[in-house]
Amino acid sequence: MATVDRWLLPDGIEEVLPPEAARIEAARRQVLDLFQRWGYEFVVTPHIEYLESLLTGAGQDLDLRTFKVTDPLSGRQMGFRADITPQVARIDAHTLRREGPNRLCYAGSVLHAQPRALTTSRSPIQLGAELYGDASPASDIEVISLLVETLELAAVPDVHMDLGHVGIYRGLARAAGLSGEVEQQLFDALQRKAMDEIEALTAALPAGLGNMLRSLAELCGGREVLDLAQAALVEAPDAVHAALDELVAIADALELRYPELPLYFDLGELRGYNYHTGVVFAAFVPGEGGAIAQGGRYDDTGAVFGRARPATGFSTDLKTLVTLGDMRLDEAVRGVWAPDNHDLYLWQAVRRLRSEGERVVQALPGQSEADAREAGCDRLLALRDGRWQVAPLAS
């Protein structure tokens, strides 16, 4: 092996160096503290599991993004987690088994066999919050509000929120009696706003249903879209009206809470259609090709673990938040340099400073004040008037 190969990392895998690693960790702590203030309890899930557990109830997309290995102890197939959300759903449904609403949050590295896009990391730090046990729009409003405040805490500028509801398309598709294959083809065409394909796939449907399905591709824009949708879908089944009413209620609450937050509605955007069951949402910023955070309702996911539960939540990549945002973090390199000296009073001074929250670096044999700057210190402990005192480090 050539020497150069010994330090090369795989595509999409990166190491994080100081001080960036310190910024990411400080951001993680601040966001988890925010989640805790909202009542969300922190959980830690395994990095690797048997595939049967890891992929139960998950879609093909997660299967393709999961690194797979063979367990040398059991011979069974295992996978490195590519998404923490299903693991947390299992904790709620099978492990905790609480009856009422349950709020859980998490932060941890995940590993992707395939990147989501050409320039994205294959080792993001997934951060998220999930609310289980309540099927009302109040839960969706809470998690979207928590996402907004997470992005505000991270000081990510120029955020706009996209909202949709998979129940609208699903209700129309069922009323039209679309086969699974045609429903998927029409879904794909709607994502691409491919009007010729949409026309062809809906041509044989009753005029009313065909017109309503075709209208989804054009129902995108600001708040006025919801008014247009109520007119365009007036003859839709009750399930569609219920979904639209949920979206209106969520939009009303977000506009009241965050009047400066731009909201964009796209009733043909069916992100996570095979996974989500209700409202879907994503946060975007200018200059980023994809969503920087996303989420939605995914009721009954826990059924595969023995207990169906309403669920809604969101996730994001902590590294992305730190890169895009301007979170107030204590980035200044500060510390106290203690000389290489075994004096008991020096040791007591070092312990006192550390107990007060100071960062103290003790010199090793052969080191001097000249090494203090490289160690991130801006002050030193100096013996003056018979006492060890903190003094500025000479420049």
Curated annotation (Swiss-Prot):
Gene Ontology CC terms, in alphabetical order: cytoplasm
Gene Ontology biological process terms, A to Z: L-histidine biosynthetic process
Subcellular location: Cytoplasm
Domain of life of the source: Bacteria
Coiled-coil positions: none
A Pfam entry, by short name: tRNA-synt_His
More details: This function is generally fulfilled by the C-terminal part of HisG, which is missing in some bacteria such as this one.
Listed name of the protein: ATP phosphoribosyltransferase regulatory subunit
Organism: Ectopseudomonas mendocina (strain ymp) (Pseudomonas mendocina)
Gene behind this protein: hisZ
